Amino acid sequence: MAIAQNQDIKYRIKDELKMPDFNYGDIWEDPKSGHRIGCLDISKKEDVEKLMHGQKAVLAVQDPPYNVDINDEFGNLPLNQYMAWSEKWVDNIIDILDANASLYIWSGADVKNGLQPLPDFMIMMRDKPVKIRSFITMRNQRGYGTQKNWMAIRQELLYYVKGNPIFNVQAEYTDILKKTKGYYKKINGKITENFERSKSLTIRAGNVWHDIQQVFYLMHE
């Protein structure tokens, strides 16, 4: 009885949580928070300006297609076409950034095709009015591998800044205890390891991320 009851609740919830019906050009604004969600083309300047409604952003997080043909959702373009498209949306996003803003861009590297588009994208960004601040690697919750290679489980995140945005360094400190000892060094004639020299017993977040819950876009979660 309990199992049947749980299944009934599951299906009722599934029926109630229907996907929003968006058509191209539609923008929905949350009446409580003011958040705006649009079905738009990021490579079109007028679409980006329509979503921003005259406002500027202090933070932008972009997760474009990686130009890797991994399923039926996204194909892959010739690299020159992909880069031309990328340059359009990058310019549009930079235009709506505040004078002091942070820009995070997820990217991928196709090991079967010269690691494109990651290095090409990074070179393109050198000519943009933003500065690279960090090259972050995230360890995915799941990966894929073969019997003849290391499992592919990493994902790249580029962190750029425009102007001089605030960076809250205190937010980097976690409650995770340090575990790895080593890095021995002589201080005042005494051999010490990094635990003894550290000002904190917990880990400070760096540019390698792990244990972050992911939402997989092919799953209804």
PLM regions: where:
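Core catalytic lobe of class I
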Residues: 1-220
